[in-house]
Design a protein with these regions (language model features):
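N-terminal beta1-alpha1-beta2 module of alpha/beta enzyme domains
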Residues: 1-5
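Structural detector of well-ordered beta-strand residues that form the stable sheet scaffold
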Residues: 6, 36-38, 93, 112, ...
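Active-site mouth loops of central-metabolism enzymes
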Residues: 9-17, 86-96, 156
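Active-site beta-loop-alpha junctions enriched in small/polar residues
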Residues: 10-12, 40-44, 95-97, 116-118, ...
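Flexible, glycine-rich active-site loops centered on histidine and acidic residues
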Residues: 13-75, 117-119
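An alpha-helical appendage that flanks or caps ligand/catalytic pockets
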Residues: 51, 57-82, 122-180
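Histidine/acidic residue-rich metal-binding segments in metalloenzymes
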Residues: 88, 104-105
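A conserved active-site cap/scaffold subdomain adjacent to cofactor or substrate pockets
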Residues: 99, 105-120, 125
Length: 180
């Protein structure tokens, strides 16, 4: 009952905001106070994926307005009531690239950093997180900046064995960047 459940990341450009809100409100109804919603802005890595989602590479970026719409459905301030209604609320985390950090700061939301943002130079990484903290606009729900760091870790008896554990994931990542 103490373990939180959540999405590693719902890529918001691939979904309607009302549907995302209702899916997570249903999870919240089943597991009250234990659900987290991570929202990202990726549109799909390959052209076949973008076509399957019916989104062109040149589609307008609606992430900020869609994120705000999801937030309004979750807090009950939207013109439409997302069902089931929740009393406890579902916290939103922005899956952050450098742009995502700026959006999260403006909206007063927590961030999850990992992957690309952690791959940039250490000075840039520190600068990006410092800028998020400086630009953060406090809200009632989030009075101060909140950063979650996501790292891949492989634990084994030796370095070689740990590297071997990462091979399937590396292969899957390479394959998905090629085929979607």
């Amino acid at each position: 009952r103490d373990i939180r459940l959540g999405s590693g990341g719902v890529m918001l450009p691939n979904h309607q905001p009302l549907i995302v809100a209702e899916q997570f409100l249903m999870l919240e109804a089943l597991y009250p106070g234990r659900i987290d919603l991570g929202l990202g802005r990726s549109l799909g890595f390959t052209e076949p994926v973008r076509q399957a989602l019916r989104r062109s590479k040149d589609a307008p970026d609606t992430f900020v307005s869609d994120l705000d719409e999801v937030r309004r459905y979750l807090d009950g301030s939207a013109a439409v009531t997302a069902r089931p209604a929740s009393q406890s609320g579902v916290p939103i985390f922005v899956l952050a690239t450098r742009t995502g950090l700026k959006v999260a700061a403006q909206l007063g939301l927590p961030v999850v950093v990992g992957g690309p943002i952690l791959g940039i130079g250490s000075t840039d990484r520190v600068e990006a997180l410092d800028e998020y903290r400086r630009a953060f606009r406090a809200t009632d729900a989030h009075p101060e900046p909140y950063v979650v760091v996501s790292l891949e870790v492989a634990v084994a008896d030796s370095t070689d064995a740990a590297r071997e554990l990462l091979i399937p994931e590396a292969y899957a990542l390479a394959e998905s960047s090629r085929t979607g």
